[in-house]
Curated annotation (Swiss-Prot):
Its EC number is 2.7.4.9. It catalyses: dTMP + ATP = dTDP + ADP. Belongs to the thymidylate kinase family. The gene is tmk. Phosphorylation of dTMP to form dTDP in both de novo and salvage pathways of dTTP synthesis. GO terms for biological process: dTDP biosynthetic process; dTTP biosynthetic process; dUDP biosynthetic process. HAMAP family: Thymidylate_kinase (MF_00165). The lineage of its organism: Bacteria, Pseudomonadati, Thermodesulfobacteriota, Desulfuromonadia, Geobacterales. This is Thymidylate kinase. It comes from the Bacteria. ATP binds at G9, I10, E11, G12, C13, G14, K15, T16. It comes from Citrifermentans bemidjiense (strain ATCC BAA-1014 / DSM 16622 / JCM 12645 / Bem).
């Protein structure tokens, strides 16, 4: 079996950039890597992503939102993640089940027990071995995210970025609560600095965690920046 790593964080935290940098280091070292994301990651789930992230769809209810995420995840796990792990690849996923707990649970206030049950059903109990939480103040993350959106041509995925500061603070608190509850799986990295600063912190955090997991080869790959 392969090794499953997820990257999590609030809007604009820099997780997508750090995931890409890790992919490049792994591939340069000869590792086989599958990079994917949620919502989306495959054609069926990408159609649901378009609905979920389009600001024009502000009428989506919290429950409908939750169920769309679960449906997209069920397809994504079976079509992309499980096959890649069975091929022995390292899977890097931009958001996974923790995002649903943070956004729909802590942010929207939906029942956490229901979310846990849906996540278990959608994933077939597939869970990451390691989750990298890129944490930064809400104001910093939103400033970056909105600047990125304004610079983007074509369809803008901005429904969550347009939520209130209070919503995003609840999401951040939800992530930090998860990290405290599952310290054996989470590493928390300060993402308030620039890309290089954050990258160095990610590399060192991964090196230490991989060594503790007995993944010496992967630890050596991830230490470079």
């Amino acid at each position: 079996m392969g090794f499953f790593i997820t990257f999590e964080g609030i809007e604009g935290c820099g997780k997508t950039t750090q995931l890409r940098l890790l992919k490049e280091r792994l591939e340069a070292a000869g590792e086989k890597v599958t990079v994917t994301r949620e919502p989306g990651g495959c054609p069926v789930a990408d159609q649901m992503r378009a609905i979920l992230l389009d600001a024009k769809n502000s009428a989506i209810t919290p429950l409908a939102e939750l169920l769309l995420y679960a449906a997209a995840r069920a397809q994504h796990v079976q079509e992309v993640i499980v096959p890649a792990l069975e091929r022995g690849e390292t899977v890097l996923c931009d958001r996974f089940t923790d995002a649903t707990v943070a956004y729909q649970g802590h942010g929207r206030g939906l029942d956490l027990t229901v979310i846990e049950e849906l996540n278990t059903l959608a994933t077939g109990r597939v869970q990451p071995a390691l989750t990298v939480l890129i944490d930064c103040p809400v104001e910093v993350g939103l400033s970056r995210a909105l600047a990125r959106i304004e610079a983007t041509s074509g369809a803008k995925e901005e429904r969550f970025e347009r939520e209130s500061l209070l919503f995003h603070q609840k999401v951040r608190n939800g992530y930090l609560t998860l990290a405290a509850a599952f310290p054996e799986r989470f590493v928390v990295v300060d993402g308030s600095g620039d890309v290089r600063q954050t990258g160095l912190l990610v590399a060192e955090a991964l090196r230490q965690r991989m060594q503790s997991l007995g993944k010496a080869g992967l630890a050596a790959v991830k230490a470079g920046c």
